Amino acid sequence: MLRFVTKNSQDKSSDLFSICSDRGTFVAHNRVRTDFKFDNLVFNRVYGVSQKFTLVGNPTVCFNEGSSYLEGIAKKYLTLDGGLAIDNVLNELRSTCGIPGNAVASHAYNITSWRWYDNHVALLMNMLRAYHLQVLTEQGQYSAGDIPMYHDGHVKIKLPVTIDDTAGPTQFAWPSDRSTDSYPDWAQFSESFPSIDVPYLDVRPLTVTEVNFVLMMMSKWHRRTNLAIDYEAPQLADKFAYRHALTVQDADEWIEGDRTDDQFRPPSSKVMLSALRKYVNHNRLYNQFYTAAQLLAQIMMKPVPNCAEGYAWLMHDALVNIPKFGSIRGRYPFLLSGDAALIQATALEDWSAIMAKPELVFTYAMQVSVALNTGLYLRRVKKTGFGTTIDDSYEDGAFLQPETFVQAALACCTGQDAPLNGMSDVYVTYPDLLEFDAVTQVPITVIEPAGYNIVDDHLVVVGVPVACSPYMIFPVAAFDTANPYCGNFVIKAANKYLRKGAVYDKLEAWKLAWALRVAGYDTHFKVYGDTHGLTKFYADNGDTWTHIPEFVTDGDVMEVFVTAIERRARHFVELPRLNSPAFFRSVEVSTTIYDTHVQAGAHAVYHASRINLDYVKPVSTGIQVINAGELKNYWGSVRRTQQGLGVVGLTMPAVMPTGEPTAGAAHEELIEQADNVLVE
């Protein structure tokens, strides 16, 4: 997570932003400079671009039986394959706890049929999303949320939401309902060994207020807003015990009606973060926290489309699979005493970074939302050979596997190795969008239908549409050849010059139109068949990013006839008449991001805080840190090469394409050297 956010930074630091919202929406602003170099002269334009994001969404969240993960428990109580060493536990009861031999033998008989299932991801996600929702409350930005309307003069789109934003809540409250819900049966526990087979939580370092917070996060979660992270969740256990020195009664008194809502409010975000920090640190749940943070970030937001077709992306909600809760860490007081076993180096690094700057989760979510949509769109584009050297043998099966779906999109977009979620059978996916030609019908109000594929007052969209500009992750190695996504490219001569224009291949035509739009020109064109309804390349005024047009996915269209280059009313840089052989010059184009800030409403502007990679040095004393050579498959990454997308165990950086198609070959030669060592 941290390394993904800092991937393009030259000084090993990154801009981080705290969660913010204006009725479920916020805007990211970038300051951009584009240089045009030709005839040994350099002209430039400095301009602002913006991208809206929405926190609104309604993911389908499933809680299924998952795998047990005992990482973090003391090494001497685990077997070589990561299971619990029961004999060592029983010996510890005899030697250290002073339990008589016959009592230990009786206990050993009782536990023969017990489950030793341990998975805290569901609880950690509840705690983490409660923290973010409470931050919105404290900023005066908590609301039900709404999706902004789209109106371009041709069509109008207003997608419905479940809860009216004007009638929704204005502050975060306990997500359970004491008047209708049944709550888990919980009890305080401090004995040396358990007597019944239920989850046992170890919350010994937490204050009473923090323990109450954990207990309430174990309860049912009702969806009270339209925000994606405010998803419905069942109570995590029917009954459980918590290991603590005191019996905590505040939550029980509130449930029984002995305390009012005002007397038992959710704690501040600072207290929530403190509880999360203590719970993860004491239970050594670094690996599981990594998984929880990944899942929450992957569903937290989506870009608000700047074109009508892009609204098809907002009509699809994620399918999320989360493992059911279980905990054995509190069953014995000594399980967490000693060196923590099998902690993954990346998880430990991200944990330290998030505790130093919780804004990392929100910033990462912004970047993932852009890369996910862009990667899914580029998957379809690349199948035609646009901007890459792939053919029909190209392997993209990683998109079809739920556990690698998101990572496949990230790798397809950025060229980086995209780390998996760190746990098997835990994922975010979009099952309706697995096929290239999936059709989405967007309900619209038609004003002027020219240029749109409209059937019965619905805009018909094939495949995953591009919904945003890439400036939040810019530059990225989206293709194997130089192009606008990578920040540097050259406008080359046309394939053929005619009296009324010039003929380009599809990639070169897009590069030409992109540069001309930034300079202040419109590019008009024709293509074979002329069935797509487009006559010029489109770019939204808010970001000036010329999208790859839909016709590139048409196998019958091989070339683009640029018929005219027209100066816009707002013109910025004088360029040669590039579609004429008499005036053509080779133009080098380079783009740089200077500054980024986010805005939620007219007066809420948030500038970046920064975190330095050299500052994030996780304490590994008493922790067995494992490196890439010892990872299980679910700690690998999805890698993009010229042969396709595949899962690998090592991580290496993306290679930004230059004038030659080097990305695929270079990927197979460059390997990031793992600097993590095994700490015994």
UniProtKB/Swiss-Prot annotation:
> Where is the protein localized?
Virion
Under the heading Gene3D superfamilies, the entry gives: Major capsid protein (3.90.1840.10)
User: N-acetylmethionine: which positions carry it?
Assistant: 1
Could you tell me the keywords of this UniProt record?
A: Acetylation, Capsid protein, Virion
Q: Which GO terms describe its biological process?
A: viral translational frameshifting
Q: How is it modified after translation?
A: Acetylation is necessary for viral assembly.
Matching entries from InterPro entries are given as: Major_coat_LA-virus, Major_coat_LA-virus_sf
Q: GO CC terms for this protein?
A: viral capsid
> Where is this protein primarily located?
virion
The answer on whether this UniProt entry bears the keyword Acetylation reads: yes
Q: What is the protein's known function?
A: Capsid protein self-assembles to form an icosahedral capsid with a T=2 symmetry, 40 nm in diameter, and consisting of 60 capsid proteins asymmetric dimers. The capsid encapsulates the genomic dsRNA and the polymerase and remains intact following cell entry to protect the dsRNA from degradation and to prevent unfavorable antiviral responses in the host cell during all the replication cycle of the virus. Nascent transcripts are transcribed within the structural confines of the virion and are extruded into the cytoplasm. Binds and removes 5' cap structures from cellular mRNA. Forms a covalent bond with m7GMP through His-154 of the capsid protein while releasing the mRNA body.
Family classification:
Belongs to the totivirus major capsid protein family.
The protein's name in its UniProt record: Major capsid protein
